[in-house]
Design a protein with these regions (language model features):
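Short alpha-helix in the alpha/beta-hydrolase fold that links the catalytic acid
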Residues: 35-38, 139, 163-173
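Serine-hydrolase catalytic machinery in alpha/beta-hydrolase-like enzymes
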Residues: 2-96
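Gly/Ala-rich beta-loop-alpha elbow adjacent to hydrolase catalytic centers
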Residues: 102-107, 111
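Conserved hydrolase catalytic core segment
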Residues: 113-124
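C-terminal catalytic histidine-bearing segment of alpha/beta-hydrolase fold enzymes
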Residues: 168-212
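Active-site nucleophile loop of the alpha/beta-hydrolase fold
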Residues: 52-55, 126-134
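Short beta-strand/loop motif that positions the catalytic acidic residue
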Residues: 152-155, 159
C-alpha cells in the first residue's frame, strides 16, 4: 500500500494573478502532464491550472467499486492532497466559487468523491467517466450544500470500468445536495475523452462562467 506526496504541475496564469483556478485530476496509469493538456481544449480564460501527480500513477490500487478499506491508505491520502491544494488556492486569494475540478476515469471518481465530501459553492466540476467511490455508498461521508454548483458527468454505456448504475446513483446524491448536475451517457463510447465531451464541458461548466 502507498500514500501520495505533494507533487503538482501548474500552467496558465500565475495563481496570484488568476481570477479562477482549475484542478485537473488524472486517471489510473496516466499523469499530471497528460490531464493538464486538456486546458488547451477547454478555452478557460484568466485561470491558474493545477494537476497533482499520484504515486505509481494511481490514486488508489483497486477498482473504485471495491470496499473503501481495500483502497486505503491511498484513497484518504489522495483526498487529503486535493484538500491541501484547494486550501493553497484559497490562501492565494481565489474564492471557492472560482475553483473548478476536471477529472477522467479514476480522476473523475476522485473528483466526485472529494467535492461531495466537501460540498460547497464551487465554480464547477467535470467528471469524464466516473462515480462516487466504494462498494457501497456511505452517505455519512457526504455533507454540505453545493448551492447550484454546475457538475457535468459523462460516461459510455457500457463502460469497462464504471457501471452506468453507479454514475446515475452519484448524480442523484449530488442533486440531493443541491448540485446542478448534467449527465450525458454515450452508447458504445470508448474509455477515453471525446471531442463531444469536451464541447459539452465548455458549454455547461466553463463558457457560462467566463464573465463571472
Amino acid at each position: 500500500m502507498y500514500t501520495h506526496q505533494k507533487n503538482s504541475i501548474t500552467a496558465g496564469v500565475p495563481v496570484a494573478e488568476a481570477k479562477k483556478a482549475v484542478i485537473f485530476i488524472h486517471g489510473r496509469g496516466s499523469s499530471a502532464e497528460d490531464i493538464l493538456s486538456l486546458n488547451n481544449h477547454l478555452g478557460i480564460k484568466d485561470a491558474a491550472f493545477f494537476a497533482p501527480q499520484a504515486t505509481n500513477n494511481s490514486w488508489y490500487p483497486y477498482s473504485f467499486m471495491a470496499p473503501v478499506k481495500e483502497n486505503q491508505p491511498a484513497l484518504d491520502s489522495a483526498l487529503g492532497l486535493i484538500k491541501e491544494l484547494v486550501a493553497e488556492i484559497e490562501n492565494a486569494g481565489i474564492l471557492q466559487d472560482q475553483i473548478y475540478f476536471v477529472g477522467f476515469s479514476q480522476g473523475a471518481c476522485l473528483t466526485l468523491e472529494y467535492i461531495t465530501r466537501n460540498a460547497g459553492k464551487y465554480g464547477g466540476a467535470v467528471a469524464f467517466t466516473g462515480g462516487l467511490i466504494g462498494k457501497e455508498i456511505n452517505m455519512q461521508n457526504y455533507k454540505g450544500n453545493f448551492k447550484q454548483t454546475p457538475v457535468l458527468i459523462t460516461t459510455g454505456d457500457p463502460d469497462p470500468h464504471v457501471p452506468v448504475s453507479r454514475v446515475e446513483t452519484s448524480k442523484g446524491i449530488l442533486e440531493k445536495m443541491n448540485a446542478m448536475v448534467s449527465l450525458k451517457i454515450y452508447p458504445g463510447k470508448l474509455h477515453t475523452i471525446s471531442k463531444q465531451e469536451i464541447l459539452l464541458a465548455k458549454e455547461i461548466v466553463f463558457d457560462s462562467n467566463q464573465l463571472r
